[in-house]
């Protein structure tokens, strides 16, 4: 019984630490990519990749998102890519954060794609039209933040006489449960 109680207390402490302390201890993990196919002009090109903010989970904690934006900008990236799941369900989750996230800066800009949560499939919408309107609003908010959404689109990043393609594809994933009305 003593071992079980110890494990239970340890589990609770770990959950509380992760929920209240660990979740705002953002860390930078640097990865160096090398390839003979990478144009020489892109040697040293810095890309910051962010994903799965699920911004609705940060309600009431704008300082943490400011801290994240400051940390990203301190990396002096050439490019920032956001790889989906900006929101949990609804575009209005961005209300307190849109201006903060607009502060992300990179020489070649901020590009994004949509994740499964961004399409709003896990929310009980009154109608399909409401869900579609939410997606339109989310795309508009990203544009207002200065983010360039690549949804089955591409752009070329140019350095000197060299270029590479940045390609964004639509999320083809399906939610585990379909909520249709």
Spans of model-derived segments:
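Acidic, histidine-bearing metal-coordination/catalytic regions of metal-dependent phosphoesterases
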Residues: 1-46, 51, 55
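N-terminal start-of-chain detector that recognizes signal peptides
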Residues: 3-7, 18-22, 52-53, 83-85, ...
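Extended active-site neighborhood of metal-dependent phosphoesterases/phosphodiesterases
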Residues: 25, 29-34, 99-171, 175
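Membrane-embedded segments
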Residues: 27, 43-133
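Structural motif
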Residues: 37-40, 72, 158
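Intrinsically disordered, low-complexity acidic/polar segments
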Residues: 42, 175-176
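Conserved small/polar residues in nucleotide/adenosyl-binding loops
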Residues: 180-181
């Amino acid at each position: 019984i003593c071992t079980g109680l110890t494990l239970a207390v340890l589990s609770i402490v770990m959950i509380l630490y992760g929920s209240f302390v660990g979740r705002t201890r953002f860390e930078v993990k640097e990865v160096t990519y090398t390839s003979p196919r990478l144009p020489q002009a892109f040697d040293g090109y810095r890309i910051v990749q962010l994903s799965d903010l699920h911004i609705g989970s940060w309600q009431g904690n704008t300082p943490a998102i400011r801290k994240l934006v400051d940390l990203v900008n301190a990396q002096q990236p050439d490019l920032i890519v956001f790889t989906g799941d900006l929101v949990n369900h609804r575009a209005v989750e961005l209300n307190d954060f849109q201006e903060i996230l607009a502060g992300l800066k990179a020489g070649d800009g901020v590009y994004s794609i949509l994740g499964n949560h961004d399409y709003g499939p896990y929310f009980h919408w009154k109608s399909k039209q409401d869900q579609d309107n939410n997606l339109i609003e989310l795309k508009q908010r990203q544009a207002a933040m200065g983010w360039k959404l690549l949804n089955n689109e591409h752009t070329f990043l140019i350095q000197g006489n060299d270029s590479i393609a940045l390609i964004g594809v639509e999320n083809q994933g399906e939610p585990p449960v379909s909520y249709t009305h």
